[in-house]
Amino acid sequence: MEDCLFCKFANGDSAVNKVFENDDFIVIRDINPQAKNHFLAIPKKHFKYLAEMTEEDSALLARILKTIPKLSDLLELGGGYRLVINQGDDAGQTVPHLHIHILSGQKMGWQPA
């Protein structure tokens, strides 16, 4: 999508420090971290909501989810980690491009609201 910041990051049209990249997605550090280690896994294909996903998109998301544990050392996930996907304004989705928050590096409680 032409005006999507995350599409620009993923496609190399806007400068960002990529921690990891493959054919499916990139990983960057969150600019407003909510944990000691806070990364974003951003699919290169644009879609905003899980409900918009095709079967192909579902396979893409599965590949991303299978890759994240393999990045354990790079992302410092050793003590455990949390994955979050916000869907919609009320959930805190601030960028209209589906992405996965990867949080680690500290003991986390459960305070979703």
Residue ranges of each PLM-predicted region?
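HIT superfamily nucleotide-processing domains
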Residues: 1-113
